[in-house]
Structure formats: structure tokens, C-alpha cells
Amino acid sequence: MAVGIFGLIPSSSPDELRKILQALSTKWGDVVEDFESLEVKPMKGAMTNEVFMVSWPRKETNLRCRKLLVRVYGEGVELFFNRDDEIRTFEYVARHGHGPTLLGRFAGGRVEEFIHARTLSATDLRDPNISALVASKLRRFHSIHIPGDRIMLIWDRMRTWVGQAKNLCSNEHSTEFGLDDIEDEINLLEQEVNNEQEIGFCHNDLQYGNIMIDEETNAITIIDYEYASYNPIAYDIANHFCEMAADYHSNTPHILDYTLYPGEEERRRFICNYLTSSGEEAREEDIEQLLDDIEKYTLASHLFWGLWGIISGYVNKIEFDYIEYSRQRFKQYWLRKPKLLSFFPS
């Protein structure tokens, strides 16, 4: 039985959503005009937004339904990024063939093209063939030129988040996470990795749920650019490696298993695929340098998402144990720091 779209998708502006659908109906011309016949399926695994797949029957019943994606923004996300900047990035990346097309915006959400591909699973990231495709696609993504200054944002963004976390959280959590000392950790870490390094347009949230594969062509699509910005490419790869510890579709999606963090052979293979995807041979010294930089940047990833989790725990109503997630990210930071950095006190 079809479920009415306006009854299932939470929206503060149902009239705006209706206008978008009416415009699409006119543009396409081959879909039924009864919006109550649209079928809505919630997509699992999102930790910031609510995402819905909409199947829209066509007038010719022998044709497949058209599909689109409706994304309803989570509460408090304006603390993490500027939504207008994210939309501009979304549209620019789409124009350059790297993601879905924006079909419309409404207050509190947007409508996107539905990508006819399969979202990767946690185990897919360990498949050498899929991993090679992801590495190659990430290299091309990093080469996207977004208009504006090529300024890396990771450090200032974390400093801003420290202040936001302090303002939001209880004294108990502030003490538990040592928020008064985290800015010093950010400063020291920035000094340690402050060498000459390649800057690219980074996704900054390359978990498996943001990667799709067309199983007929093996084409990879990277989606969701809310945290995208210029950053060191080593940071983006480090964050991707850290995400291999997560399974957001398990019964305990907030629990991270760092025994799944890729070993040196797996990391080296990814880096080689990344560097050689442009047709050039990878030099051993470049591989070694990137290996070293990536490991140090895993610490930045732990701080980044640890702070994100603290803030999210106070502003986001999605069913996810953000605070416990943060505990694990900070625990990993303090565990790995003395092994990875040359002069920091442990």
C-alpha cells in the first residue's frame, strides 16, 4: 500500500515540498499527478539528517517508477557548517560529474537526484577491488577546483567546535573530555604535521555510507559534502581509514572496533592505488611520507569527530549514542598519540 509523502516525511514546509514535486511533475511529464500514490522509504544509517527514498509511479504502468531522494536536515547542524556553502558545493560538484543533481530546496531540507547504485557496506571497504576503485575516485575528487581560497579549515573548525562544546555540555562532560585542554592538543598537533604537504578539496567524511557503486559499471560516486573543504589529502585518507572501524548499521552503531583499522599492507595498497590512478608511477619516498602523514592525521580525525559527537549529543535528536561515540574517539586519540608523535607529552 502506498504511503502519503507528506504524512511520512517530517517537514516544516510541506507546501514548499509540494511545489518542488509539482515542478518536477511538470518537467518530467510522465509521472502520475496524485502525490498520495508516491511511496516513501526511510533510509537507515544517517547520523545527521533523515533521508527518504521516494518512488514515483509513472503514467505508463509498464515503466519503472522514477526515484528521488528527500533529505531533511537534522537539528543543530548549523553549528557544524554553513548550509548555503554546502549547497553551493553540492551544485558545483554535481556540475563536474561527481554526484547527484539538486532538484529543489525547501526550508529544512532538499530534494536530490536518486543515484541508481548501491551504497557500500562496512565490509565493502575491506574488498581490495572496491578499495582500489574508491582510492582512484578519491584522487579525482581531491583535484576538484572549488572557486575561492585554498585554505584548509580543519584546525580552525576544531577550535570553533571546542568553544561550542564548552557552551553546550555539562560540567561533568566538560571535565570527562578535558575540554579545557583540547585546544592545546589541537595546537600541538597542528605544529607536528605542519610540513609541506598536498592540499586538495577533501570530503572529510568518507565513511562507507557516503560511497556508492554501480555494480554494472563499477563506477564509484562519493556523496554528501556537508563537511567538505580544502584540507591536506593525508587527513582525508586518514579519516577514511578510521571509518573502517565503524558499522553504522549494526545493533550498536556507536561502537567502534579499532581492531578493524587497516594494517600497513592494506594502507600501502590504498595509497599506491591512489597515487597511480592518474597514470603516474608512485615513488617509494612519496608512499612512505604519505603513510607517515596519514597515521598522524588519524589523531586529528579522532579529535574532530570526538568534538562533533559531544555537540551532536546535545543538539541532535537522531537515535544515536553520540556521547559514547565521542568517548571512543577520544580514547583512541590518547592511546595512539604517544606512539605517533615525536615530542608530545603523553
UniProtKB/Swiss-Prot annotation:
Entry-linked InterPro entries: Kinase-like_dom_sf
Pathway terms, separated by semicolons: Phospholipid metabolism; phosphatidylcholine biosynthesis; phosphocholine from choline: step 1/1
EC number: 2.7.1.32
Enzyme class: transferase
Keywords from the UniProt entry: ATP-binding, Kinase, Lipid biosynthesis, Lipid metabolism, Nucleotide-binding, Phospholipid biosynthesis, Phospholipid metabolism, Transferase
Binding site residues for ATP: R71, Q207, D224
Superkingdom in the source lineage: Eukaryota
Annotated GO MF terms: ATP binding; choline kinase activity
Swiss-Prot/TrEMBL induction comment: By wounding, and salt and osmotic stresses.
Listed transmembrane segments: none
Pfam families per UniProt: Choline_kinase
Family the entry assigns: Belongs to the choline/ethanolamine kinase family.
Protein name per the record: Probable choline kinase 3
